[in-house]
Structures are given as C-alpha cells and as structure tokens.
Amino acid sequence: MKLARRLSVVEPSPTLAVSAKAAKLKAAGVDVVNMANNHALDYGPKGMQDTFNAIASSKLPVVGIGHNAAEAYRPYRTVIHGQRIAIFGALDWLEPALIPAWSATDTQPGVAMSIDRTRLVAAVRAVRPEVDTLVVFLHWGTEETYCASPEQQDLARTLLAAGADIVVGSHAHRVFGAGKVGTALVAYGLGNFVYWREDGESGRSGVLLVTATGREVDTYSWVPARITNGVPVPETGGPAAADVTEWQRRRTCSGLAP
C-alpha cells in the first residue's frame, strides 16, 4: 500500500489509500510501519512523493522506503523499559524488471531491498552494537503458501548471523508458523490484517506477541483472529484454540523449533 493521491498508475490495482490514513494509523497507536512492499511504487515516483508528504505531515514513523538508500535502510529506533530497539524493513519479492527502478540508491528514492542482501546485511551489522534487540521485517515469500521456501530460510539465517534477534514477514496472504532458530525468533508470515478477502485461508489473521530482554526472546504467542468486513476480529473459545494449534503445527515445515 502507498499513501498517495496522484494517479500516474504503473500497475492498476486497489492499493491506493488516502493520505489521511497515515494520521489515523498513528492515532490508533501504531508505532512504526514497514512500507517496503511490492506495491510501493504502483503509482510511480509521483505517488511515492505523495507518500513521503503524507508521512511527513502525519509524523508516522516508517521503515523500508526513503528519498535515498541511507534513509530507506535506516532502522526505526526506540527505547522501551530501558531496552534499545531497532526495527528494519525491506522487500524481498518483486518482478525482476521492476527492481532497478524501485530500489533505493544513493541518488534515487525507493524501497529497501533484501533481494540483493549486501546493503541490508551491512546495515544490520552496523547497528547491532548500538542496540539491545534488533528486528527485521521483510515483505517476502510465495503467495498462498504457508511453508517458508529454502530461499527464505537462508535469508533468515543470514540476517540472524548478521545480528538480528527477531525476523518477521508477510506477503503470502497466509499465516505461517513461528518458532526458534537457535535463540532467535522467526515468523515467516503473519497473514492478512486489514484486507478485502475474508474467505478460507485469506481470512485467517492474528497478532504475534513477543517479549524480549536484550537478545533473549522470553516469550512469544499468537492471538488468532478472523477477518470480518475487512478487519480482524479476535477469536475466542474453540475456534481460537484450533487456530493456535494450527499455527504451532505450521512451524515444522519451515524448519523452526518451538
């Protein structure tokens, strides 16, 4: 999704949001948004500039896009209960023909990419000594699957080796399982959240809750929901328990431990 109003369309699709939505997200309590996704430049450079303007006026912190590479690969930083936290955002899935025009470079606005891992890995390594907990949020994976590909698993391990403590992602429109790789946490897919489809697997949603102390992930859990009229509604009782059990089961095919 992008926050724009000009309609110089690269890819006709229902991915345009009015700029006021940025302020609404901030008012709702959203701390930071990963804007690196495969629709970020559907409306071209003018649409991206409108997105920058909307972000600036709302003061909503975002990661994963920027006026240049330094900005796009810059993490959001905050301190919670004395713990220094950094959150990166990047895109790992895009049609190859679009990559040059969409990638943030030293002289070009655009999206942070992990397709070429070099810059993202370097950014993670550079920030690692300065924070207690480091999170990377990726837009990645194959749509309508719920098992991580070998490429995803390799990228997750690469980022963990570079210093990430938590790797989280989305894009497949499916809820993946989550689990440990060593002492780190990986959640390959959080599914849909606010979305127009609500049937079957597309309607499976939820919130991943994680507590961490420094580099140690203390607890993690899944609060399941079902999308109803476009928004997630928390589940209760038997349906909630069944969805949590399925979420736990799905970690196995992605090579994750409890």
PLM-predicted stretches and their roles:
Residues 29-258:
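Acidic, metal/ion-coordinating pockets
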